[in-house]
C-alpha cells in the first residue's frame, strides 16, 4: 500500500532541468514510485495540479547555526523548501570555543536565547540532535573563530606557536564533525590572516580528510579580481576545493568585473582546480556595519574600536576619512 500519492505535480527532479508532470508515490519516508498512479490506491492523495514538486533545497551558505537550537522547527527555511543547511560560513562557526571565541559566541547565542553548553562540534551537534531539528544540518569550521581562539581579535601575523595551535583546532574540529573550513576576509579577525596562515589551515583541513575551503573574499568590489586569484591560488597550493561564497561584483562601477572573475574560475577549473561559486539573486547584501570603517580603526579588537568611536576627536577624523574614501557609496548603504 502506498502511503501518499502526490498527483499531477510539475516535477523538477534535480537532474534534468526540464520539468515533467506526473504522480509520485511515497512509502514510509521514501519516494517509491514516479509515474501514472491514477489507478493506484493510497492512504492519502494530494492534488498537486498547478504546483511544483522538487527535492529539498540545500542552503550551502547560512548564518543561522544558533537558531538550530533556538527553534528547531526552522520554519523560516522549511517553508522555503530548504531541507539541508550548511553553517559555519564567512569564518564564523559555533565551535571550537576557546578564550575570546567562547566569550563572543556566548554573547551572540544569548541574543537568540541560547546558552552555550558546548566547546566543540561533537558536543554542539549532540545537543542539536537531542533537542531535535527539522533540517539536515552540518557546518564548516570558521577561521575567524579559530584565530580568535588563539589570538583574540588582535591584528598581526600569528607566530609559529599560535599558527600551530590554530591548525590543531582545525584538525580537531574536522575530527569532531566539521566539513571543511571557511574564511571571512573582510571581518575581524579573519581579515588579518595572511597567505601563510590560510595555506597552513587549508593544508590542515586537507590532511584531516576534508579538503574544502569556502571564502567570503577579501574584496568583492574594487579589488575583486585579485581576491578571486588569492582564493584560487590557495586551492592550487593546498590542493583543496574552493567555494567562492555569495559571489558578486559589489558597487555599480564594478558590476562588469563578474564576467572576468567567472572566466578566472573557468580557467582554474581547466587547470584541475576544484572551484565553484554560489550567488543570490538580488543586488543587495547584509553585513556588519563596522566593515565600512578603515581597517586601522578596528585594530586592537572590538573594545578598542568602540573606544575610538566614543572619542569625539577620533570619531570626527574617522568620519572625514569615510567621506573621502566612500564619497560615491553612501547612497547604497542602508542602516
Regions found by a protein language model. Name each.
Residues 90-97, 110-237:
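Hydrophobic, small-residue-rich alpha-helical packing segments that form membrane-like cores
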Residues 74-114:
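Hydrophobic or amphipathic alpha-helical targeting/insertion segments
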Residues 9, 29, 50, 61, ...:
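Divalent metal-coordination and catalytic microenvironments
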Residues 1-40:
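N-terminal metal-binding scaffold of metallo-dependent hydrolase/deaminase domains
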Amino acid at each position: 500500500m502506498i502511503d501518499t500519492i502526490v498527483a499531477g505535480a510539475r516535477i523538477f527532479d534535480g537532474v534534468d532541468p526540464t520539468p515533467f508532470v506526473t504522480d509520485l508515490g511515497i512509502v514510509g519516508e521514501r519516494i517509491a514510485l514516479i509515474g501514472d498512479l491514477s489507478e493506484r490506491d493510497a492512504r492519502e492523495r494530494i492534488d498537486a495540479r498547478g504546483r511544483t514538486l522538487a527535492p529539498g533545497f540545500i542552503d550551502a551558505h547560512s548564518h543561522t547555526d544558533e537558531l538550530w537550537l533556538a527553534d528547531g522547527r526552522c520554519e523560516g527555511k522549511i517553508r522555503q523548501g530548504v531541507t539541508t543547511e550548511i553553517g559555519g560560513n564567512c569564518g564564523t562557526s559555533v565551535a571550537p570555543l576557546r578564550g575570546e571565541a567562547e566569550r563572543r559566541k556566548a554573547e551572540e547565542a544569548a541574543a537568540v536565547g541560547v546558552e552555550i553548553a558546548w566547546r566543540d562540534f561533537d558536543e554542539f551537534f549532540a545537543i542539536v540532535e537531542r533537542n531535535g531539528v527539522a533540517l539536515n544540518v552540518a557546518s564548516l569550521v570558521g577561521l575567524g573563530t579559530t584565530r580568535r581562539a588563539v589570538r583574540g581579535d588582535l591584528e598581526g601575523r600569528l607566530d609559529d606557536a599560535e599558527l600551530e595551535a590554530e591548525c590543531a583546532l582545525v584538525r580537531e574540529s574536522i575530527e569532531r564533525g566539521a566539513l571543511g573550513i571557511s574564511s571571512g576576509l573582510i571581518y575581524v579577525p579573519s581579515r588579518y590572516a595572511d597567505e601563510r596562515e590560510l595555506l597552513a589551515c587549508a593544508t590542515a583541513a586537507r590532511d584531516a580528510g576534508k579538503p574544502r575551503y569556502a571564502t567570503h573574499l577579501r574584496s568583492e568590489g574594487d579589488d575583486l579580481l585579485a581576491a578571486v586569484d588569492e582564493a584560487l591560488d590557495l586551492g592550487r597550493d593546498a590542493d583543496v576545493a574552493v567555494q567562492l561564497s555569495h559571489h558578486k561584483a559589489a558597487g555599480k562601477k564594478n558590476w562588469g568585473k563578474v564576467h572576468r572573475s567567472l572566466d578566472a574560475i573557468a580557467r582554474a577549473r581547466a587547470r584541475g582546480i576544484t572551484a565553484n561559486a554560489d550567488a543570490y539573486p538580488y543586488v543587495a547584501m547584509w553585513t556588519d556595519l563596522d566593515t565600512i570603517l578603515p581597517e586601522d580603526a578596528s585594530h586592537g579588537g572590538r573594545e578598542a574600536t568602540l573606544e575610538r568611536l566614543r572619542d569625539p576627536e577620533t570619531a570626527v577624523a574617522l568620519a572625514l576619512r569615510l567621506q573621502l574614501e566612500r564619497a560615491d557609496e553612501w547612497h547604497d548603504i542602508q542602516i
